[in-house]
């Protein structure tokens, strides 16, 4: 058992949370802290927001050190399988996803009205780095929640209400790239 915290043991990551521009970024993301009147988990000021980010990142770090990193080798050995036309994750991957879902770590940057945490993108990317350190493959799965930013930014209110709560609950998220002759041909992408 590793029993490490992949956030508290990384001063480089913690450094970015305290960047001087974060105060302006957070005030914008938090609409000058007006949501504190509507949501119990919304910060009242920058110090409150910073404390929220720090606590959530500490939880991410703890889960990654105590669960995800511990499962990484068995996840690589077992790998996913296709069963009856559906992907079945390795047992360790499923355990990782379950623990992350139980901790409420999906929808980190999505609005509170959809049960997201409404964090700026910087703490989300910090969390993504922590997850990647523990298991880069899991980061590819967990990080898909960032795709929901496109829905949040451009979808109708009806589409947002349909999909964003499900992303925040860890029920759904995918990035599908298909149609090499008519759309997204990833194999043909060149630098």
Regions found by a protein language model. Give the residues of each.
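Conserved glycine-bearing catalytic or ligand-binding loops at nucleotide- and phosphate-handling centers
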Residues: 141, 147, 165-166
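Amphipathic, small/basic residue-rich leader segments at the start of a protein or domain
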Residues: 1-142, 154, 158, 162
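Glycine-rich, Trp-frequent "lid" loop and neighboring beta-strands that shape
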Residues: 117, 158-191
């Amino acid at each position: 058992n590793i029993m490490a915290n992949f956030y508290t043991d990384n001063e480089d990551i913690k450094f970015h949370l305290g960047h001087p521009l974060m105060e302006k970024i957070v005030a914008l993301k938090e609409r000058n802290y007006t949501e504190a009147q509507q949501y119990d988990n919304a910060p009242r000021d920058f110090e409150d927001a910073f404390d929220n980010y720090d606590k959530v990142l500490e939880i991410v770090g703890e889960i990654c050190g105590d669960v995800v990193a511990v499962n990484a080798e068995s996840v690589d050995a077992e790998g996913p399988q296709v069963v009856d036309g559906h992907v079945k994750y390795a047992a360790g991957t499923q355990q990782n996803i379950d623990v992350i879902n139980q901790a409420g770590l999906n929808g980190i940057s999505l609005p509170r009205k959809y049960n997201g945490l409404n964090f700026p993108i910087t703490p989300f990317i910090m969390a993504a780095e922590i997850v990647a350190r523990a298991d880069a493959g899991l980061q590819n799965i967990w990080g898909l929640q960032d795709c929901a930013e496109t829905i949040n930014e451009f979808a109708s209110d009806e589409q947002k209400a349909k999909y964003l709560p499900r992303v925040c609950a860890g029920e759904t998220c995918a990035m599908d790239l298909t149609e090499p002759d008519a759309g997204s041909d990833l194999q043909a992408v060149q630098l």
